[in-house]
Each structure stands twice: as C-alpha cells, then as structure tokens.
Amino acid sequence: MDLLHKNMKHLWFFLLLVAAPRWVLSQVQLQQWGAGLLKPSETLSLTCAVYGGSFSGYYWSWIRQPPGKGLEWIGEINHSGSTNYNPSLKSRVTISVDTSKNQFSLKLSSVTAADTAVYYCAR
C-alpha cells in the first residue's frame, strides 16, 4: 500500500458550514446545522429551519461550493415532499422535509474528500 492510500485511510476532512449560520432572505430566515467533520464513507447530515415566512409554496434547496470552485446545486424539496436532485449526486442524496417544524434536511452518503465544500440551504 503506497503512502497516499495509507494516508487516505485516515483522512479526516471538513464539510464547512456557513460562518454565520443565520441570514435573511427578504423576511425569511434560514438556520442550518449538522456535523462538520466526517471520515470518508460516512454520511453527511444537515438540517435547515425556516423562520419568518411561508414554508409552503416554495422549493427549498441545498447548494454547495467546493474550495476554489463555483456553486453546485445538490437538490430541492417542497412542503409536500416532492424532490429534484442533481443527477450526478442522485444516488447518494436524500432530501426530506418536516412540515411540523418548517425544516428540511440533507443526507449525503459515502462522502469522500471530493465532497468537501461549504454547504448552503436556500429558497
């Protein structure tokens, strides 16, 4: 086993969250939370809560930005649970909704270093 593969076995990486996790979109505020440090092959879980506006009538999205790269759309969900996913991530992504709490969640399975990014929830 070469040194690179040996080091990859023990690789930890950061899935960065927004430094200021609550921000305002019009009168709607979104607050997200979740694990920021994972080992390869683990599952990333993030949740976003919507405050101060209507939850129904919109699609709620997850977007990410890898270091030094542009934004990448992950997927979206509406209040009734209808989803759309980025085809390149679809096999590993699940987005769910909890209308009783005005929250929606992202799960990304089998993460690798290529999934290192700033993850955003958005309307």
UniProtKB/Swiss-Prot annotation:
Lineage: Eukaryota, Metazoa, Chordata, Craniata, Vertebrata
GO biological process, one term: immunoglobulin mediated immune response
Pfam families linked: V-set (PF07686)
Ranges for region Framework-2: 60-76
Region (Framework-1): 27-51
Region Complementarity-determining-1: start-end pairs: 52-59
Residue ranges of domain Ig-like in the record: 27-123
One term under GO cellular component: immunoglobulin complex
Species: Homo sapiens (Human)
V region: annotated span: 26-123
Name listed for the protein in its UniProt record: Immunoglobulin heavy variable 4-34
